[in-house]
């Protein structure tokens, strides 16, 4: 799924930053920042580059997240897609193809990075080795999966002034999938209906 394989690292002017290699301190710092947002809405821009730096795809859209495990990612036209989870299953709707794919949500953080922002991250240290740097109002984390059966080799997650700012995922062949978040709003009331999907008439349904 294109949207779950997406992330962005902005060039951060960190000034004098301090690197922390203590995994327990990094886990505590990351979970503290993530748990501040029980709900989150934002717009995003998405950029995917191959291993040589060639641009493969650029999109934008909006997202809504709610703990535990609910998310809605809507990519704008011309590559419109809608990805929704109610915490148990996922709908991937492509209006151009008039097709929706429905599958069980993979609860592993290494397989569904969106759950870092919306799921249960109490056992995050079981999935990742984590380090971080902090300077000024910026905190930049690097997450390395502890198993090989993952979508990515490295995931970077950055916060600015306590809000998620950008993410980047790098896979085994060097492809980088990036997301930059902006207009981020936390802990506002969200309608539960936006985390379910009613299949439009005439749309093909694929169950996986």
Swiss-Prot record:
Q: Which CDD domains match?
A: LolA
Q: Which UniProt keywords apply?
A: Chaperone, Periplasm, Protein transport, Signal, Transport
Any one GO BP annotation for this protein:
lipoprotein transport
Which GO CC terms are listed, alphabetically? outer membrane-bounded periplasmic space
Q: Does the keyword Secreted apply?
A: no
On the tree of life, the source organism's domain of life is: Bacteria
Quote the SUPFAM superfamilies the UniProt record gives.
Prokaryotic lipoproteins and lipoprotein localization factors (SSF89392)
Pfam families named in the record? LolA (PF03548)
Where is it located?
Answer: Periplasm
Q: Any keyword Acetylation?
A: no
**Major location category of this protein:** periplasm
Q: Where is the signal peptide?
A: 1-21
Q: What happens when the gene is disrupted?
A: Essential, it cannot be deleted. LolA depletion affects cell envelope stability, and decreases the ability to cause infection in a G.mellonella model of infection and in a mouse model of pulmonary infection.
Q: Summarize subunit and interaction data from the UniProt record for this chain.
A: Monomer.
Q: Which NCBIfam families match?
A: lolA
Query: Which family does the entry's similarity section mention?
Result: Belongs to the LolA family.
What HAMAP family does the annotation carry? LolA (MF_00240)
Function, in words: Participates in the translocation of lipoproteins from the inner membrane to the outer membrane. Only forms a complex with a lipoprotein if the residue after the N-terminal Cys is not an aspartate (The Asp acts as a targeting signal to indicate that the lipoprotein should stay in the inner membrane). Important for cell envelope stability and growth.
Q: What PANTHER family is this protein classified in?
A: OUTER-MEMBRANE LIPOPROTEIN CARRIER PROTEIN
Q: What is this protein called?
A: Outer-membrane lipoprotein carrier protein
